[in-house]
């Protein structure tokens, strides 16, 4: 696996407030955002920050939004192909990660899966044909 974090996604309870905080408060540059979009992305130096409704992020990862197992944050590592996603996912499992959601074609047009590291931190491994996050 190439040692790089592509996208950090915060599961947020109040998307409008968080958008205002990061865009207006911190001055982070928005990427391709239109009012009403569920996902807000900020292009940072070498990585991206995403804001996504907390309940939708939990649903995407197939975990409960409440209780243990979901902190409201998913760290993403992007690969340039579906095959790359499968390889990294297998590598993570071989290293001791737990499969949360096997890689599959997803609603936003990409391909992704989720695993938890040995302490339960949630990682997404994804191929995004719409944006080069690799």
Feature roles, as predicted:
Residues 1-7, 29-116, 127-134:
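Vicinal oxygen chelate
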Residues 12-15, 107-108:
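Conserved beta-strand-loop-alpha-helix junction that forms the acyl-donor binding cleft
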Residues 18-23, 92, 120:
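Conserved active-site tyrosine of GNAT-family acetyltransferases
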């Amino acid at each position: 696996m190439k040692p790089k974090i592509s996208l950090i996604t915060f599961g947020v309870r109040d998307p409008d407030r968080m958008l205002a905080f990061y865009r207006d408060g911190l001055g982070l540059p928005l990427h391709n955002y239109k009012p009403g979009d569920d996902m807000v992305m900020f292009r940072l130096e070498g990585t991206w920050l995403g804001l996504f409704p907390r309940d939708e992020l939990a649903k995407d990862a197939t975990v409960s939004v409440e209780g243990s197992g979901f902190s409201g944050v998913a760290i993403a590592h992007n690969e340039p192909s579906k095959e790359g996603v499968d390889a990294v996912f297998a590598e993570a499992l071989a290293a001791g990660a737990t499969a949360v959601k096997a890689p599959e074609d997803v609603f936003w047009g990409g391909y992704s899966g989720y695993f938890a590291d040995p302490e339960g931190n949630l990682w997404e491994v994804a191929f995004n044909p719409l944006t080069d996050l690799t």
